[in-house]
UniProtKB/Swiss-Prot annotation:
SMART domains: THUMP (SM00981)
Family stated for the protein in its record: Belongs to the methyltransferase superfamily. RlmKL family.
Every THUMP domain range: 46-157
Designated name of the protein: Ribosomal RNA large subunit methyltransferase K/L
Name of the gene encoding the protein in the UniProt record: rlmL
């Protein structure tokens, strides 16, 4: 065998340039970059060194042979020609990985079988002994890549992927692979910062991958020093003495590195369930003396190194997966930006994000950006110098002013910490930092919100209302409905039509979400966002979240429970406020029937108004339980019936009479507990006829729905005394949207 070998090193997409620099520094020659890989030439010592020291590679492949290939037979004979007895015992184990397609092979499993067959046939002994397949821990892992008619046959020297360092046995929901984390640290300048004695802090550390990789770099620990089994361990070409020499050198370097004064490396994680797994990972890496992890929110993040040294803040914020995550992610980035500006002045920061647009919401400019891939997700690494000239705040500076600031950076005096009488540091007064500046669109949106607040202010105060709609798609480009619930904000985003560029729609949403807390003077953690779109099947009733957090609100002398997070609607239709108040005024001494009752808020008002009895019918057990809580909250119980059932079937079976009936049906509904599908336009006549049959003489039926295209059937107007009262049932906060609902008063003709 030759003294030099062709090597292929694979890596995550986007790391090729960094890996080429690292591999060249470790001795690889004639280095060339490919997609998700590099190649070069090296002797065996360099090949071993790459396995041991590469922080960025996935695998180190030693090329055995290249050969042209036209079909499966060429593949078989090309592999068969290799002197496999120089590489593997006849009773050894193999695993074959095949990549690429063409030359008559479009199935990688078939290609791998042909490679395996050739190796087995070559090594089969006269007495029938032959290699067997072990896909988990083989003696030899063989890789064949088919590239434009050429087969490249290699041995995998690494065995399992090199990103598996052995310390991370516990991980969070969205982990970074260790070699990607190392690449981000290298791009962020951590090797330089660590060599200068700088600190590192991760405000969203998860299970500590950034922390451990940073500690290994700072302590000069080979990333794979603890690996016991390699792809070359049972390879007949392995040179154990050479490997032991390199491994002993790495052990000596690690011992010397750990003997140094430890770098100040700290992680903070809001989820208490991840704290112990993170500490366990750190302990397995042997870095417990270097790295500490604490529970803490981003909003209170403040790194306090022992020697007041500056350093690097690095983090990988979570990716939004659930409906409504946009708001929480936006405010997370805003909080991060605020903490950087307030607590990390003159530090460097590196934010690895799958949502680069959110990175613009931190209120700090990035001076460099790098593209990476986290699996199949394109990501950006934003590098930031946390200095005042990079802050994006309310004050707009000219390019000339920014140039002056760059040429004359602000000097920040480092003040020695004062201690209290117990010898503990006295926490300094927080630095006052301006809020991040809203975009032009965001400021325009904020102005509209404040204008609406001012216009409704007198009415709100006069009526004693603190739950009302402050914005309802007033500006077409900001298609939101925004409701105030005292000191909470409930935001519903109307799904953008397909003709709207998704990136523009997302940017406008972020502009609006950034503006809402400032314009309404509301804590950003009390903003809840949902997306409202056409629902199908039972989705209109499905749970969106599972927080189970109910708020108590008051209206017209009654108390009601709302839930802003768990369902698409909150349990209280604000637009029906006037209708509920009308029912309360008219209910005294009457038998009240509430059909499609939802959470029975109208029944609570009827009971408050002195109704002789209330009966509420709904198909959902969840909403009826909610209704029971609403009634109990107000001390109403015995005379108020709650029945689960299909309204149409219930009306057909019921023979009781009612003096006051309220019907507010959905546009459509289907369920396993009902026959067929209810459609309000189609079924209105049958529904109202059935309800009118239950109306006592002199009684009143109120019918309402929010189907914008609804047309009341003319037969109903001929049969009953029908009055359109829509205008009387819409308050000032919904006056901008006259089609929010339609309402009619229906009575028997005299």
């Amino acid at each position: 065998m030759s003294d030099r070998y062709e090597l292929f090193l694979t890596c995550p997409k986007g790391l090729e340039g960094l890996l080429a620099e690292e591999a060249t520094a470790l001795g690889l020659q004639e280095t060339r970059e490919h997609t998700s890989a590099i190649r070069g030439s090296a002797d065996m010592e360099t090949a071993y060194r790459l396995c041991l020291w590469s922080r960025l590679a996935n695998r180190v492949l030693l090329v055995l042979k290249r050969f042209p290939m036209k079909d499966a037979e060429d593949l078989y004979h090309g592999v068969l020609d290799v002197e496999w007895q120089d590489h593997l015992e006849s009773d050894g184990t193999i695993a074959v990985e095949f990549s690429g397609h063409g030359s008559g092979i479009d199935n990688t499993h078939f290609g791998a079988l042909k490679v395996k067959d050739a190796i087995v046939d070559k090594l089969r002994t006269p007495d029938g002994e032959r290699p067997s397949v072990d896909k988990i821990n083989p003696d030899l892992r063989v890789h064949l890549r088919l590239d434009r008619g050429e087969a490249i046959l290699s041995l995998d020297l690494s065995g399992h992927s090199l990103h598996q360092r052995g310390y991370r046995l516990q991980q969070g929901a969205a982990p970074l692979k260790e070699n990607l984390a190392a690449a981000i640290l290298i791009r962020a300048g951590w090797p330089r910062i660590a060599a200068e004695g700088g600190a590192l802090a991760d405000p969203m550390c998860g299970v500590g991958t950034f922390l451990v990789e940073a500690g290994m770099i700072a302590a000069d620990i080979a990333p794979n020093i603890k690996r016991e089994r390699w792809g070359f361990s049972a390879w007949l070409g392995h040179v154990p003495a050479l490997w032991r020499k390199l491994h002993d050198e790495a052990l000596a370097r690690a011992e010397a590195g750990l003997a140094k004064t430890p770098s100040w490396i700290r992680g903070y994680e809001a989820d208490p369930r991840l704290i112990q797994p993170g500490r366990n990972n750190i302990e397995r890496a042997g870095l417990s003396d270097w790295i500490k992890v604490y529970q803490g929110e981003v909003a209170t993040f403040e790194p306090r190194p022992d020697q007041n040294q500056k350093g690097l803040v690095i983090c990988n914020p979570p990716y939004g997966e659930r409906l409504g995550d946009e708001a929480s992610l936006l405010y997370l980035y805003q909080n991060l930006g605020e903490r950087l500006r307030q607590a990390c002045l003159n530090w460097e920061a590196a934010v690895f994000t799958g949502a680069p647009d959110l990175g613009k919401r931190m209120g700090i400019r990035s001076h460099k950006q790098y593209s990476f891939w986290n699996g199949a997700l394109p990501c950006k690494l934003l590098l930031i110098k946390v200095t005042p000239d990079q802050f994006v705040t309310g004050e707009r500076r000219t390019p000339e002013q920014r140039q002056i600031e760059r040429e004359n950076p602000v000097e920040v005096e480092v003040v020695e910490r004062k201690l209290n009488k117990n010898g503990n540091p006295i926490k300094p007064e927080p630095v006052v930092v301006e809020q991040a500046r809203l975009s032009e669109g965001g400021q325009m949106f904020a102005n509209r919100l404040q204008k609406n607040l001012k216009l409704m202010g007198k009415w709100v105060r006069r009526e004693g209302i603190d739950r009302y709609r402050v914005y309802d798609a007033d500006m077409p480009e900001y298609s939101l409905a925004i409701d105030l619930y005292h000191d909470w904000v409930h935001v519903q985003e109307y799904a953008a039509p397909k003709s709207i560029d998704p990136e523009k729609a997302s940017a406008r949403l972020f502009d609006a979400l950034a503006a809402i807390p400032q314009a309404l003077n509301i804590d950003k953690n009390r903003v809840v966002i949902k997306r409202r779109e056409r629902q199908s099947g039972t989705k209109q009733y499905e749970r969106q979240s599972a927080q189970g957090q109910f708020l108590e609100v008051s209206e017209g002398g009654v108390k009601l429970l709302v839930n802003l997070t768990d369902y698409l609607d909150t349990g209280l239709f604000l637009d029906h406020r006037p209708m509920r108040m009308r029912i309360q005024r008219e209910a005294s001494g009457k038998r009240f029937l509430n059909l499609f009752a939802y959470t029975a808020t109208a029944s609570v008002h009827a009971a408050k108004g002195g109704a002789r009895s209330t009966t509420s019918i709904d198909l959902s057990r969840t909403y009826l339980d909610w209704a029971r809580r609403n009634l109990s909250l107000n001390g109403f119980s015995d005379k108020n019936r709650l029945e689960q059932g299909d309204v149409m079937a219930w009306l057909q079976a019921n023979r009781d009479e009612y003096d006051l009936i309220f019907i507010d049906p959905p546009t459509f509904s289907n369920s396993k507990r009902m026959e067929g599908i209810f459609d309000v336009q189609r079924d209105q006549v049958e529904l109202i006829d059935l309800a009118m049959a239950r109306l006592a003489p002199g009684g009143v039926l109120y019918f309402s729905n929010n189907f914008r295209k609804f047309v009341l059937d003319e037969n109903l107007s001929q049969r009953y005394a029908v009055e359109d009262i829509t205008a009387q049932t819409i308050d000032q906060d919904f006056a901008r949207n006259g089609k929010i609902h339609r309402a009619w008063k229906i009575m028997a003709r005299a």
